[in-house]
């Protein structure tokens, strides 16, 4: 399985703990985030099961996966302006989904979805966190069949 945009590695660690038979690739663009993820992976003794990969999106991920988890940057422009101070302490790249110019916060998600099938095995599943941006997501991808729990 893949945890894309792993950040501090928490989803990768949780997945490895939940499914002991699974190997996890955990990828992020940020070397700082991967350094924190490495600390968390080592803290839980999961170095043999979680592989940390520096990758800008799909760039360094040639494989296919049964499950891809992703907590991408998805906050829209208006949401970024209204973020509480404690959220602004996070790196901008981990939150701002409009770094390529869109107001809806779906820049990275557009790229992610455009190439997801190239990285999913048949019957594979992609799970995305979208936070409070469901309206923007549905407007950006009106024909995509999405499940909302």
PLM features: what roles do these ranges have?
Residues 1-82:
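Conserved SAM/SAH cofactor-binding pocket of Class I
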Residues 3-9, 73, 98-105, 124, ...:
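Glycine-centered flexibility sites
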Residues 18, 84-87, 144:
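Glycine-rich, phosphate-binding/catalytic loops in enzymes
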Residues 51-53, 93, 147:
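Structural signal for short hydrophobic segments within the conserved structured cores
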Residues 62, 86, 138-139:
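Short Asp/Glu-rich motifs
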Residues 73-107:
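Mobile active-site "lid"/loop adjacent to the S-adenosyl-L-methionine
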Residues 102-149:
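Conserved Class I SAM-dependent methyltransferase catalytic core
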């Amino acid at each position: 399985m893949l945890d894309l945009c792993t950040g501090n590695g928490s989803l990768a660690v949780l997945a490895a703990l939940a499914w002991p038979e699974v190997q996890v690739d955990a990828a992020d663009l940020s070397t700082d985030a991967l350094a924190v993820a490495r600390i968390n992976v080592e803290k839980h003794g999961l170095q043999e099961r979680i592989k940390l990969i520096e990758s800008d999106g799909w760039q360094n991920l040639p494989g296919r996966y049964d499950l891809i988890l992703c907590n991408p940057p998805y906050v829209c422009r208006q949401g970024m302006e209204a973020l509480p101070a404690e959220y602004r302490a996070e790196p901008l790249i981990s939150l701002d989904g409009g770094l390529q110019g869109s107001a809806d916060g779906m820049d990275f998600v557009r790229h992610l979805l455009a190439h997801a099938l190239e990285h999913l095995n048949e019957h594979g599943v992609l799970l995305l966190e979208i936070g409070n941006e469901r309206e923007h997501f549905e407007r950006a991808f009106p024909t995509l069949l999405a499940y909302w729990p």
